[in-house]
């Protein structure tokens, strides 16, 4: 399943400038998701991080992983309608073992690879990895819960 940014916005509430997922290229419900964000010098974050030496912030990479994980959790919840999805939100409970292995710069395509470690009811434990040109740049374990708004 491929999702463009319009489809993504039907599932998660994030909007510019905080929507950090441009496209989902693969979803295997209850298993994994692959998606990406194109990093451009026009991203607002580069106005201050860092002038003359732009580096995409690690916390933004983690947030992008979280958004991708939210899509995976929603899509794995069965045949949830757009209306049902609109009445729910994903809260992240913890981010553990976060590591940043290489800088991400303007011009990079940041690929998120998210996989389910465990799911029990509304609680999801996910393994998140971020790559640029198949080089691991960041990883973390994410725990999230889907709740009513």
Curated annotation (Swiss-Prot):
Its EC number is 4.2.1.59. It is found in: Cytoplasm. GO terms for biological process: fatty acid biosynthetic process; lipid A biosynthetic process. It catalyses: a (3R)-hydroxyacyl-[ACP] = a (2E)-enoyl-[ACP] + H2O. It comes from the Bacteria. The keyword Lipid biosynthesis applies. GO terms for molecular function: (3R)-hydroxyacyl-[acyl-carrier-protein] dehydratase activity. The active site is at 49. InterPro entries: FabA_FabZ (IPR013114), FabZ (IPR010084), HotDog_dom_sf (IPR029069). It is an enzyme of class 4 (lyase). SUPFAM superfamilies: Thioesterase/thiol ester dehydrase-isomerase. GO terms for cellular component: cytoplasm; membrane. The keyword Lyase applies. Keywords: Cytoplasm, Lipid A biosynthesis, Lipid biosynthesis, Lipid metabolism, Lyase. Involved in unsaturated fatty acids biosynthesis. Catalyzes the dehydration of short chain beta-hydroxyacyl-ACPs and long chain saturated and unsaturated beta-hydroxyacyl-ACPs. Belongs to the thioester dehydratase family. FabZ subfamily. This is 3-hydroxyacyl-[acyl-carrier-protein] dehydratase FabZ. It comes from Sulfurimonas denitrificans (strain ATCC 33889 / DSM 1251). The lineage of its organism: Bacteria, Pseudomonadati, Campylobacterota, Epsilonproteobacteria, Campylobacterales.
């Amino acid at each position: 399943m491929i999702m463009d940014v319009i489809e993504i916005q039907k599932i998660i509430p994030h909007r510019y400038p905080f929507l950090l997922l441009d496209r989902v290229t693969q979803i295997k419900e209850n298993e994994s998701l692959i998606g990406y964000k194109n990093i451009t010098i026009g991203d607002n974050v580069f106005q201050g991080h860092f002038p003359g030496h732009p580096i995409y912030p690690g916390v933004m990479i983690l947030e992008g992983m979280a958004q991708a994980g939210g899509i995976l959790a929603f899509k794995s919840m069965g045949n949830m309608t757009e209306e049902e999805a609109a009445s729910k939100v994903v809260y992240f409970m913890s981010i553990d073992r976060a590591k940043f292995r290489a800088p991400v710069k303007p011009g990079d395509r940041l690929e998120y690879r998210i996989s389910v470690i465990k799911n029990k009811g509304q609680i999801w434990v996910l393994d998140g990895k971020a790559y640029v040109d198949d080089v691991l740049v960041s990883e973390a374990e994410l725990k999230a819960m889907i709740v009513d708004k």
